[in-house]
Amino acid sequence: MSQRIFLPDTLANWQWPRHLNPHYAEVKKASAAWAQSFRAFQTKAQEAFDRCDFNLLASFAYPLADEGDGCDLMNLFFVIDEYSDVSTEEEVRAQKDIVMDAIRNTEKPRPAGEWIGGEVARQFWDLAKKTASSQAQKRFIDTFDEYLESVVQQAADRNNSHIRGIESYLEVRRCTIGAKPSFALLEFDMQLPDEVINHPVIKELEKSCIDMLCLGNDVVSYNLEQARDDDGHNIVTIAMNELRTDVAGAMIWVDEYHKQLESRFMENFKKVPRWGGPIDLQVARYCDGLGNWVRANDQWSFESERYFGKKGPEIIQRRWITLMPKMVSEELGPQIVDGSHL
């Protein structure tokens, strides 16, 4: 008999509701066409990539945005993710160098025959930086570099079959999830000084938010990742290993830890200091954006076909799924999820 898994409803009491950007349809059309133009994947994998609808994630995460920068960034993230997941540490290091060179030198044409991720990154940042404040630009570049460095570390762990402990894993996962550069987009139209964005309360808010994103993503992605034999960088596997428990026990632990993070976030949300003037309005919008990101990530996970195929809307209600059989990939890139197995 197939093993059944219960997905904890970690956001049952989360105060931020589902909020979709009203421009979703038009920005999705433009960004999806842009992403497809690079031909980063073969036909079947590209279809699976399209079904993941990373534009939907961006439209949940940036519900007030007028531009499609968030959509383009999410598409860039997942191009990097799909390639790095099947690459060696040395290959991922080279990919990182290409992407950061492209971002730092958007006016420079990319060399013929170079990995396509460089041109995707160059085009994204060449357009996105035009609408970003100087502070937000710097923070994006710094945090994107940090994100890519952590992806190199993830590749090293994978190549060495290294399973980390919970704390060590979270240190790396806080970067591989890509939340910090995603948060930089929240402040593209803001003028937040370093002393504001680096205030201890703001930093704690970000940390709790990131940890909830990590746990939430790992819970919904575990089944697909174990089927692809790529679950070594997942809190469910990490908890099973450290706590010497099974999948059900790990899910219970994740649910309890998520509740602690939620309480910590709300406590700090109430402690956000005031600086006076328009800064306070920008800070309020930024912090609200953090809370919304948690909901956005969860909502997209079930409304797209990334993890559950067409069964997501049903699974978000019943929460029970069946452990998927092992999958063999025929092409580089995402695979279409057959929801009938869930």
UniProtKB/Swiss-Prot annotation:
GO MF annotation terms: metal ion binding; terpene synthase activity
Residues holding Mg(2+) 2: D81
Biotech use: Melleolide sesquiterpene aryl esters are cytotoxic secondary products with anti-cancer potential. Armillaridin shows therapeutic and radiosensitizing effects on human esophageal cancer cells. Armillaridin induces autophagy-associated cell death in human chronic myelogenous leukemia as well as of hepatocellular carcinoma cells. Armillaridin can also inhibit the differentiation and activation of human macrophages and thus might have potential to be developed as a biological response modifier for inflammatory diseases.
Enzyme Commission number, as recorded: 4.2.3.135
Gene3D superfamilies linked to this entry: Farnesyl Diphosphate Synthase
InterPro entries: Isoprenoid_synthase_dom_sf (IPR008949), Terpene_cyclase-like_2 (IPR034686)
Motif interval(s): DDXXD motif: 81-85
List of residues binding (2E,6E)-farnesyl diphosphate: R306, Y307
Keyword terms, alphabetized: Lyase, Magnesium, Metal-binding, Virulence
The keyword Ubl conjugation is assigned to this record: no
Binding locations of Mg(2+) 3: N217, S221, E225
GO biological process: isoprenoid biosynthetic process
Additional notes on this entry: Armillaria species are both devastating forest pathogens and some of the largest and oldest terrestrial organisms on Earth. They forage for hosts and achieve immense colony sizes via rhizomorphs, root-like multicellular structures of clonal dispersal. An A.ostoyae colony, known as the 'humongous fungus' in the Malheur National Forest in the Strawberry Mountains of eastern Oregon, was found to be the largest fungal colony in the world, spanning an area of 9.1 square kilometers. This organism is estimated to be some 8,000 years old and may weigh as much as 35,000 tons.
Protein name: Delta(6)-protoilludene synthase
Species this chain originates from: Armillaria ostoyae
Lineage of source species: Eukaryota, Fungi, Dikarya, Basidiomycota, Agaricomycotina
